[in-house]
Structures are given as structure tokens and as C-alpha cells.
Amino acid sequence: MDEKTKKAEEMALSLARAVTGGDEQAAIKYATWLAEQKVPLRVQVKPEVSPTQDIRLCVSVEDAYMHTVTIWLTVRPDMTVASLKDMVFLDYGFPPSLQQWVVGQRLARDQETLHSHGIRRNGDSAYLYLLSARNTSLNPQELQRQRQLRMLEDLGFKDLTLQPRGPLEPVLPKPRTHQETGQPDAAPESPPVGWQCPGCTFINKPTRPGCEMCCRARPEAYQIPASYQPDEEERARLAGEEEALRQYEQRKQQQQEGNYLQHVQLEQRSLVLNTEPAECPVCYSVLAPGEAVVLRECLHTFCRECLQGTIRNSQEAEVSCPFIDNTYSCPGKLLEREIRALLSPEDYQRFLDLGVSIAENRSTLSYHCKTPDCRGWCFFEDDVNEFTCPVCTRVNCLLCKAIHERMNCREYQDDLAHRARNDVAAQQTTEMLRVMLQQGEAMYCPQCRIVVQKKDGCDWIRCTVCHTEICWVTKGPRWGPGGPGDTSGGCRCRVNGIPCHPSCQNCH
């Protein structure tokens, strides 16, 4: 080393010590000498100046197709932009040559630190633009080699080169150019076979359904070349995918068969019990698994006692779900097998008898045997005049609606009129009913024509014989022919908010 170079190094070190110690005069002196000698220098702030604690950096990443995503990186303010590029390369696979960093609205250079760009606190932001690799010389082998070199540098191994495994190939002499041989150059190498990822431009193998780098789906228009032969690695991957698909289909089939068997077993049960803790919406009892009943039609859950009480107190052949709140009344019905499983044999028989009685009373073509306390009845047709009761075996006349086995119809009618003239009690009863009908204190049922009257309360009543719901104020049926809820007929009370009559006192 000559004297001039040695002197320049001493003056540079003296300048560094003077700046560090805050000696302005000495720093000016040394800097002036170095400037006069035109000594080339590189001035760089030591890492100790920047904070060393880790911070969270918010990075907005955008590619050539204007796709944007936000990621968070754990960095130190004293890191250089080059180190930041290496971090992104190792973590996300984007080579440093494709990264353009913008920090504080300024293009960052590799040797600059994050601290110099104002990155000092958690939540500070930066912008990363990813260049397209379409026009670069990157290929999968070069990309893998760069990643391995970066990993070796992180481990402290520098100035290394990666050698391929296996026996060394003999060094071939350099081929002569066409100027030396007088022949044209060989044809350029054919482009690699595969499809190019529209996101990161990586060339993937033809059979791969998604990008190996960014997992983006293969373009739908791409067709695998007919002459393409997969290599060993691809064949292994395809075999693994086929095996995974086979196992998936097998598990799916097993699950379907299990679900089917579960449904079959559930269908064979009369009652569906709850599998999770539930609360009865009627009595608010907390029910453990297996203590409540889930109705098949509407899936509402109740305790057994509340359902049994609902069935016993029902006046209809079809028992409605008892669920009701301020906004909703469930229209679901209990199934016959659910009712049979909930009730005792005696209660179930009474329920069946109620259904038969309702069916009889609501039919205009039904006739009940006139024998006292006899349960026999029938549906009659126009061409049938007599009914032999299967219970008491008495013969009923369907024309006279009576039993007169030793008289014909004319004789029975004459005898009935004669007895009515001499029966004072019958005459008084007939007169009382006529007066009540005239004064509006009683009315004929619009279905079965018996006399009904209202004791007190609202204007809704139910016929005790045919169970027809009646609107007292309009003297007609409450609902249409479809039954409860059918507003196509009946009094149509509260349809569009309009009462059925100015004097209506709520007919439900």
C-alpha cells in the first residue's frame, strides 16, 4: 500500500471519529483534505443509529393485472430494502428482480434502510409492485437455485455455488459459430411445454390443474397436447390425486349409506326424541336429551305432558302443533302414529271416537240411530230409505228420521201429530224457541240447523253437534268451506282490517 492510500484511509477514519465525537472543526479539516485529494468515499450510517426492535409493516401488494392484496411483515427499521426483498422472496417466492418497493411516495433503493424512509412504528405502510416475469429469463430451475442461495446466505455461507449431483459430465469443446464454420446457427430451443399462469406468469406442467407458485386455476381454454407424455414426477402426482379422489368417493359413499340407515331407523320409530337439551315452549321445562319429542311435520320440540294435554283437549280430529307466540301460530299437525305413541290405549280410543263423532256431525249425509244411547250411525244415499243399525239391530226410517217398526210412514206421521196436540210441554218448548228466534236470542246452526244460543262473551260460538264455528252477529259460518283460516267465505272478519259487522264484538 502506497503512502497516499494509507494517508487517505487514516484521514477517512479520523473524519468518522470526529463526526461521531461531535468535533466540527476536526471534521471540516479532514473532509477538506479528502475533497482536495478527490478520494472516492462511501459514507453509510451504522445500523446502531436505527431502532432494532421488531415492528409490524403493512404492505399493499399489486401485480401487473391490478390485483391487490394486503399482507403484514415483521421487520426492523434498520433493515435495508435489499433485505426486505430477500424476506419476501423466501416467504412468498417472488424473486427480488421482480419487486419494486415504494415507501413514502418514493422509489426505494436496495442499500437504503427502512428507517431512512420513515418506517419506525407498528402499522407503518409500504407499497410493493410485482413486475411481470413474462419477459425475463426466469424458469423453475433458476428460481429454485436463487432460493437455495438466499437460504445459504442466511445461514452464513456466502460465495458458494450449487453443483448438480451425480457423476461429472465431460467438458465438451465450445462449438464454433457459423462465422467459423460457414453454416447457419442451429434452431433455437423450443419453448417449454405447459400453460402460463395468468397471475404470476409461471410456466406450469400441462397436467397441473393449478399454478405451482400462486395456486391460481388453470385457464379453461387450455388443452393438454395430445402428444404430451408426463414425466415420472407428474405420473406420481396424478396417481396420488387419483388415489385421493378414490378415497374421497369411498368416504362419501360410506357417509351416504350411514345417513340412509339413520333415516330408516328414525322412520321406524313412532316418536323422534331430542338429541340436544331443549326447553318446552309451553311449560318452559328444561329437557335433557331424550326427554322431549320433536314433531316430524314442523320440528317443534315439546315435553310429553304438554303434547298429551293438547291431544286430550283438542276438539278437532286433527291436532295442531301447540306452538304459538306474538307473531306466529304453527299450522303443523301431529301425525297419527305420534298421537298413538303419546296416549294410553284408553285415551287413544277416546280420541278415535271423537274423530268419528266429528266426521258424523259435519256430514250432511250422516244419520244416527234413534235408539237411546246407541252409537250406531251411517252415511245414506238418496235411493236408500231404511238403515239397520249394526249396534242395536233396530231398523231406522230415513224418511221419517225415526224408528217405527210396526207402522208405516203415514201412520207414524199421524200418530206424531196427534201426540203433539195433546203434549202441553212440547207445545211450550216449541213456542219458547220460536220467540227466541224472533228476538235474536237464538239462531239456527247454518250447517245442521239445530237451535243454538250465546250465553255471554264474544261473538264466536261453536255448534255442539256439528262443531261448526259460527259468527253470532252475522248469523252465519265464521270461515269458508276450507275450515279455520279460509277467508274465501264466512263472515271475513278483520280481512284488510275491516270488521264483519259494525256491532262485532270479536269473533276471533
Swiss-Prot record:
Residue ranges of coiled coil: 231-260
InterPro entries for the chain: BRcat_RBR_HOIL1, HOIL1_RBR_mRING-HC-C3HC3D, LUBAC_E3_Ligases, Rcat_RBR_HOIL1, TRIAD_supradom, Ubiquitin-like_dom, Ubiquitin-like_domsf, Znf-RING_euk
PTM summary: Auto-ubiquitinated. Auto-ubiquitination leads to degradation by the proteasome. Phosphorylated. In vitro, phosphorylation inhibits auto-ubiquitination activity.
Involved pathway(s): Protein modification; protein ubiquitination
A single GO molecular function term of this UniProt record: double-stranded DNA binding
Region annotation (Interaction with RNF31) ranges: 69-131
Binding site for Zn(2+) 2: C298, H300, C321, C330
Zinc finger (IBR-type): 349-409
GO biological process: defense response to bacterium; negative regulation of necroptotic process; positive regulation of apoptotic process; positive regulation of canonical NF-kappaB signal transduction; positive regulation of extrinsic apoptotic signaling pathway; positive regulation of non-canonical NF-kappaB signal transduction; positive regulation of transcription by RNA polymerase II; proteasome-mediated ubiquitin-dependent protein catabolic process
EC number(s) per entry: 2.3.2.31
Pfam families on file: LTM, zf-RING_UBOX
Matching SMART domains: RING (SM00184), ZnF_RBZ (SM00547)
Keyword list, A-Z: Acetylation, Coiled coil, Metal-binding, Phosphoprotein, Repeat, Transferase, Ubl conjugation, Ubl conjugation pathway, Zinc, Zinc-finger
Domain of life the protein comes from: Eukaryota
Positions bearing Phosphoserine: S50
Cited Gene3D superfamilies: 1.20.120.1750, Phosphatidylinositol 3-kinase Catalytic Subunit, Chain A, domain 1 (3.10.20.90), Zinc/RING finger domain, C3HC4 (zinc finger) (3.30.40.10), Zn-finger domain of Sec23/24 (2.30.30.380)
Domain (Ubiquitin-like): residue spans on this chain: 55-119
Family recorded in the similarity comment: Belongs to the RBR family.
Note on domains (UniProt): The RanBP2-type zinc finger, also called Npl4 zinc finger (NZF), mediates binding to 'Met-1'-linked polyubiquitins. The UBL domain mediates association with RNF31 via interaction with its UBA domain.
Protein function: E3 ubiquitin-protein ligase, which accepts ubiquitin from specific E2 ubiquitin-conjugating enzymes, such as UBE2L3/UBCM4, and then transfers it to substrates. Functions as an E3 ligase for oxidized IREB2 and both heme and oxygen are necessary for IREB2 ubiquitination. Promotes ubiquitination of TAB2 and IRF3 and their degradation by the proteasome. Component of the LUBAC complex which conjugates linear ('Met-1'-linked) polyubiquitin chains to substrates and plays a key role in NF-kappa-B activation and regulation of inflammation.
Protein name, entry field: RanBP-type and C3HC4-type zinc finger-containing protein 1
Organism the protein comes from: Rattus norvegicus
Species classification: Eukaryota, Metazoa, Chordata, Craniata, Vertebrata
